[in-house]
Amino acid sequence: MSIKIKYQKGLLRNMGIFDFKFIWLGQTVCRYNVPLDIFNVLNGIYETNFINLPDAHKQLAGKIAKENSLFFGGAANPRMHKHNTLPPYVLNWFESVFKHYLDFNKIHPYKLRMNSIWINEMKAGEYNPIHIHQGTIYTGLSSVMMLKLPKDMGPEYAREDVPMNGKLQILGAAGGQFVKSDYGPIANERDFYIFTYEMRHCVYPHTNPNAVRRTLAANMDVEYNPVGTRTAG
């Protein structure tokens, strides 16, 4: 078996697949597809119980009018109290996906503790500035789940060929030659992106006055040994 590698413009060579191994250094972003039942339950809880969901503004960076919490497992504080609106099987699903990220990245051993889950609903002009996340501890995984995306994000002010309205932008922490330093996915509903707490990210505003953009974020604290897991070998 062989694969074709395009290593120069217009030039192809055959290379045996046994001659190639991909080794990555730095941090990763993993995208998952949310099961339809989980997706519907999360949207349903938000839409039917919105009036009872705690306001999450005081502990978030977003310039968004509607930021409401579904779960908080950290220590009670003046900004938030412990609560849970999610059934056990939904929390178990979140834990299983975070475990997959860590196992895929060969991080072990580790201990997990769900810290917080909340929903942002962005109207036209609202946005999330560049920020990072943290939970009870400084090491962990954050995420963005696409719950509701307008088909029309509104008019672009310039460069319609490079649409940015309502776009998620993730900025990597790695540097150096040939590094891929940022990621702006073409997102779809049910996409779920997982990345590390300190990985900077933002969401640009959309401009459609008749639509909302709804996403979920979940923070999972991860206790692990950074020295024991730092090698890719």
Label each residue range with its predicted role.
Residues 209-220:
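A short alpha/beta connector and helix-capping loop motif
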Residues 26-28, 113, 139-141, 212-214:
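Residues at beta-strand starts and edge strands
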Residues 112-121:
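A short glycine-rich, His/Asp/Glu-containing loop-to-beta-strand
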